[in-house]
Amino acid sequence: MLRKTLTLISLRRPFSSIPSKTLTPHQKSSFESTLHHSLITHDTDQAWKVFRSFAAASSLPDKRLLNSLITHLSSFHNTDQNTSLRHRLKRAFVSTTYVIEKDPILLEFETVRTVLESMKLAKASGPALALVECMFKNRYFVPFDLWGDLLIDVCRENGSLAAFLKVFRESCRIAVDEKLDFMKPDLVASNAALEACCRQMESLADAENLIESMDVLGVKPDELSFGFLAYLYARKGLREKISELEDLMDGLGFASRRILYSSMISGYVKSGDLDSASDVILCSLKGVGEASSFSEETYCELVRGFIESKSVESLAKLIIEAQKLESMSTDVGGSVGFGIVNACVKLGFSGKSILDELNAQGGSGGIGVYVPILKAYCKEGRTSEATQLVTEISSSGLQLDVETYNTMIEASMTKHDFLSALTLFRDMRETRVADLKRCYLTIMTGLLENQRPELMAEFVEEVMEDPRVEVKSHDWNSIIHAFCKSGRLGDAKSTFRRMTFLQYEPNNQTYLSLINGYVSCEKYFEVVVIWKEFKDKKAKLEHALADAFLNALVKGGFFGTALQVIEKCQEMKIFVDKWRYKATFMETQKNLRLPKLRKRKMKKIEFLDAFKNWARITT
């Protein structure tokens, strides 16, 4: 709506119906004062009324005020809530063109740029073009570099680069005829105009005329310039012209053909000549291997052309032929097979159908054709299908890279598809992948978070002899901790025995997990057993572990063993908070009744009395 309004207003002559009358110096001063106050207070409507009063008298305010007004009207961040952006921008356009026609010397170049910047944000290409044409018509020559880029952007965004071509030509004419170098369009503008000729208008005559204009202006073409011409020549089937372009690029020292080849592919696809498009891909591989530089956009354009023509067989054939030409050092992501299948996936076309066609033709597209499909499966959560495809890949003698394995294993663990994750890891081991550490940690962490200690134990047993995996004590600790947390203390104890049998050294965390597990199930005698083993190993006792032992032993009533722990703490100068264990005793053993004295209970009574004396318990 805004663009339409501005376009219509650009066709009218502003203030043409306002009768002219002369302002006295006093009136002009009063108007300027009112205008200044209106701008300060952001009263847009009042400021506009004052400007109309000036226009009615065929006059204009002070230069500074005039530029401030137009800048205010153009602002996208104007705080005036009473006037819409559409109205303000319309008024900015009208006032600017009026000043250009009336007295352009009052208009600052930066003010014109501000207006055009706002038109760009409003996507108003029609008024922007009209404003520049008004400047030309009234010989108000603003340096091209102040407005050219803005006009190109707004025209390109609206798909009207062809409209920019007229302004470009006029600016070239002015620069030459008036000998004004600052009006010369630069290379960016020349390429935009060339894009309009080649891509939008597809006019050979206009394109060649524009190249001549560039030569007159001294603007040297770049790779993009040749690319636009290559598109047009391919679109028209002018092979000789393309050969001339390549020779010219060689003469000018352009080594890369990436843009040229991409543009040729685009032109051939647009004309329906898919065979020639395929030839460009293969030709690029015969040269310096620039197929690896083709963008995703180019591959999507190529694939779309083949799919619309129902030529999947030809697409598969292209992959096979390209695979024969690609060097062994070609990166997976840079292969033609990867580019084509990845484009299929992006366009929503089944990449698997390409694989089926490759198999039907008895050819190979290399590992690159599989990677996009695997990534798509992972993104969609189809991890079991991805794993099945990996099995097929391995059986064909191909090998995936570590990053692809990592991605698939992470996706499988996220989906809780532990079977697929473990299967993929086994495949990694069998294919002799050098780095297994990251995937190993991913699986162990995921199984721990999901409380699957039995799978963790099986996994560790399976991989612990593999030199590429470092199984350490903390891995066993994680398994023991998970078993204890889920109440499976028998399994935790068995894992502990297995750990020590394999000569992995238990540490404080190992014992803490076991103690906390037994305490939660009130199996305090097991803590006594652990203490005996700990003491026999002559392991180093730390404060947290001593606290865990004492807490469990006091709760269980094993005061003799508790005294051993206290003695060890004193020996190692570990602080023991006796008030804490006094509280634990009073909480758990306050109803303790000594049985009738018997010979076999005497030792227990002695330990109880000794502990009470140590903790200063008088009851």
UniProtKB/Swiss-Prot annotation:
Residues 1-100 form a transit peptide. One of its GO terms (cellular component) is mitochondrion. The keyword Oxidoreductase does not apply. Its main location: mitochondrion. PPR repeats lie at residues 186-221, 222-256, 257-292, 295-329, 366-400, 401-435, 436-466, 472-506, 507-541, 542-576. It is found in: Mitochondrion. Pfam families: PPR, PPR_2, TPR_At1g68980. PROSITE patterns: PPR. Keywords: Mitochondrion, Repeat, Transit peptide. Transmembrane segments: none annotated. The keyword Calcium does not apply. NCBIfam families: PPR. Belongs to the PPR family. P subfamily. This is Pentatricopeptide repeat-containing protein At1g68980, mitochondrial. It comes from Arabidopsis thaliana.
